[in-house]
Amino acid sequence: MGPLDVWDLSPLLSLWMNRFYIYMGCALGLTLCICVQIIKKQVTRSQEKRVPGAPDSSLSPQKKQTHVSGVKIFYGSQTGTAKGFAVVLAKAVTSLDLPVAIINLKEYDPDDSLIGEITSKTVCAFLVATYTDGCPTESAEWFCKWLEESANDFRFGKTYLKGLRYAVFGLGDSAYRSHFNKVSTNVDKWLWMLGAQRVLTRGEGDCNAVQSKHGSIEADFTAWKTKFISRLQALQRGEKKACGGNCKRGKCESAQHGPGEARPHPQGELHPGDAEEEEPCESSSEDELGTQDYQSLTSVVDVEDLGNIMNPVKREKREKSHQDGKAAMQRNPEKTEDGEGRAMITPALREALTKQGYQLIGSHSGVKLCRWTKSMLRGRGGCYKHTFYGIESHRCMEATPSLACANKCVFCWRHHTNPVGTEWRWKMDQPELILKEAIENHQNMIKQFKGVPGLKAERFEEGMEVKHCALSLVGEPIMYPEINRLLKLLHQHGISSFLVTNAQFPEEIRKLTPVTQLYVSVDASTRDGLKKIDRPLFKDFWQRFLDSLKALSAKQQRTVYRLTLVKCWNVDELQAYAELVSLGNPDFIEVKGVTYCGESAASSLTMANVPWHEEVVRFVRELVDLLPDYEVACEHEHSNCLLIGHKKFKIDGEWWTWINYSRFQELVLQYEESGGSKTFSSRDYMARTPQWALFGARERGFDPKDTRYQRKNKTKDISGC
């Protein structure tokens, strides 16, 4: 009997026949095992999430970073409420073991210190009250004025305060609905416009208990304070998410407005995203398409259906455009019903220029406080006119009787917000009104400077008495039909006159009464170059330009060519510049590097077009080599500017580029009393130039009587006057 005969194969046969059940059982067991492992991992993860502050054991103590170095609480208070809130907030911050400082905005100089808060990892809290007529309190007035001007000043840019973390709480009264918490809204907006990072939605405290969200202003502050402390704790942990994460274009509001959340502004404003700060557009999608069409376009649309949607849209747009055109013609006639021309300053223009710091006068004039006026009031140096001609910058009023201009220069300071034209077609104000209000507005702006850190009392008193007037603010002053009467009024008030024209009105130059100093802008040496840079409105602009230079040569008073160098645009063809000099024979030639005006759709200039001071010096030296009657006289390095003087002002080896202003007033008075028969020349009222103002001096044009101020950031200052 063989071995196979005694071996029973029935068990194996049974397993083989039931193999499918065995496979299914193994698969089921494996599946259950995997499910158990997954569930265990999920339970472990959920337990870890319940301890958000648990330290990461993988990080060594040496690798931990400090995300918040401290908190600075700034307050602007009139009755002491904001100051009291600052003390309460400081106590709460101290509980987090963070250094805290309470600062009165009246004693804080943002020009010197605010940018320093960026690198210090400090969180800044601003508690500001709205006072009479929506204005800031006296203690916060200067800070708010500086912040507004900086936010609307192209030289600061949109990233000036990038990295600064801040939160704002406002104190107001909703009974004054139109001004409710206006100051805190503006501070929040201006900080955002300068690139600062908002860490918490703006809080609003309401003194009106009936309307207060939490029953009182104290309760409003307590709710905001709780949120602020919570945000600080998150920042300490390194969380970088700002606010509620729903900020768009400066509008800061939470998705859900629960207890303690800041309300949207009653008027629904977008803080820095206001209409005037957004890119211009014709209308919104809702306006163009209608509600139903707009809603349909928010979903997926078949290509074949686009025609059915777009045809009504185009028809609506044409009808709307036609209606708007008719309305515009009815709104804007060339003359008003009483026969007078339209006002040059429209509501939109008034709003734009007011934001830029202008004080507008009547219907076509304006005055603005120059940055160099502010600088000299604080003993920080004067402008290049102080170095070249001896004007007292803190007593200089910068104004214009005409905001309109005949050119659209690529380096225009105001991005062409002012109107343009080739003739006067607007309503005209009398020169007496212009001068009176210009002086009053200038004095009011000087008064607002009182209390600013570093202000010199004696210069403040002197600044209240205007001694010089620079008619060069913006626009074309010589377009004003009564410019001669205005100049005579200036001289009668003992104010010297510095008039700038863009060389497009030769006949007006010939008729011009004597001025202290007459400037002509020479922005290019060739026809094509002038067209490219100045973009004049006149078709015969080049002939007008040449005729203006010839008219300048006939003037007996001081005349100046003003050359603005734009690298890669007008720094070549020196011989052509020399020929233009021989055409007008100016007493002086100012050569200045262009000031970068920021990005603009109207200009293609970039920082690459701004020449360095060394490049301006080299250009001046090469130009003087072609002008046998001229030499380099003065330099003002800070303004990137040099002065070329005619040799007739160099007497016995000494330059006499400064002006004897009292002597000029005597001469112009004699001229007027004689009916114009008793004339005088530029050499009759010249004064000796001090050594520090000369080219090659160690001071580089900075008056040693003042103290030079260097900004904390090391970026080279190429800003102008």
UniProtKB/Swiss-Prot annotation:
UniProt-annotated binding residues for [4Fe-4S] cluster: C405, C409, C412
Biased composition (Basic and acidic residues): 250-274, 313-325
Gene (UniProt): Tyw1
Function: Probable component of the wybutosine biosynthesis pathway. Wybutosine is a hyper modified guanosine with a tricyclic base found at the 3'-position adjacent to the anticodon of eukaryotic phenylalanine tRNA. Catalyzes the condensation of N-methylguanine with 2 carbon atoms from pyruvate to form the tricyclic 4-demethylwyosine, an intermediate in wybutosine biosynthesis.
Co-factor note (free text): Binds 1 [4Fe-4S] cluster. The cluster is coordinated with 3 cysteines and an exchangeable S-adenosyl-L-methionine.
Stored Pfam families: Flavodoxin_1, Radical_SAM, Wyosine_form
Reactions the enzyme catalyzes: N(1)-methylguanosine(37) in tRNA(Phe) + pyruvate + S-adenosyl-L-methionine = 4-demethylwyosine(37) in tRNA(Phe) + 5'-deoxyadenosine + L-methionine + CO2 + H2O
Example GO BP: tRNA processing
Pathway of action: tRNA modification; wybutosine-tRNA(Phe) biosynthesis
Lineage of the organism: Eukaryota, Metazoa, Chordata, Craniata, Vertebrata
Enzyme class: lyase
Biased composition (Acidic residues): 275-290
Protein name: S-adenosyl-L-methionine-dependent tRNA 4-demethylwyosine synthase TYW1
Enzyme Commission identifier(s): 4.1.3.44
GO MF annotation: an example: metal ion binding
Swiss-Prot/TrEMBL cofactor(s): [4Fe-4S] cluster
Radical SAM core domain boundaries: 389-635
Record keyword tRNA-binding present: no
